[in-house]
């Protein structure tokens, strides 16, 4: 039992909806995705949780309160009893909506400052893993989204091109490169009309695998003219929103 409350507070923004973020505190596969293989959670009041770190250290606790998708509270202590005995500290996670997705607020209450100081870097690291685990799930289809963007860019048929853009982009999408400074879906669609008017037959194709980190995606591309000759190449940085849709594209020509 906690005899005094020394707090560690940390806040991060996750590019995902609260309901999705909350799954990483209630689903054992998602829980293990950011804590490590063998970690489990029974997300009901009185349910048990286990954290199994890669170095063999084990943490266990009991779920005290669950209010999906806004709040979960659980005890936190080490199986060895050191530096925190079982039941010796308490973690509260609060989730709120945010323009970018979800605001996560963590409060870890300890019995003394030494315990708190021991966990400052640990939570900084662990919540970084958490942010990546959530983003990897939300954006599991990022490569397909990127390919659909390049396909839309290359599509000479306005109806199908615009339908693709509606499906993969946000209404306020922004696009920047050496030939573009665009704001909003209508602006992007008009730009694509001009592309096909002045450069008929030009297409963009992805080259190699995408690289993804927390809703930011890098994709290399090549521009191929109607005659099959390469006309340029470069890299695009895509920023995805909380639903995995394209919110921003910045192109860098090689």
Where are these regions (language model features)?
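A solvent-exposed, acidic/Ser-Thr-rich amphipathic alpha-helical stretch
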Residues: 18, 37-52, 59-61, 67, ...
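Hydrophobic pocket/interface hotspot
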Residues: 21-22, 31, 49, 63, ...
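Residue-level recognition of conserved beta-strand positions in structured domain cores
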Residues: 53, 76, 106-108, 177, ...
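Short, solvent-exposed secondary-structure boundary/capping segments
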Residues: 70-77
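A beta-strand edge to alpha-helix "cap/lid" segment located at domain peripheries
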Residues: 81-133, 190, 194-254
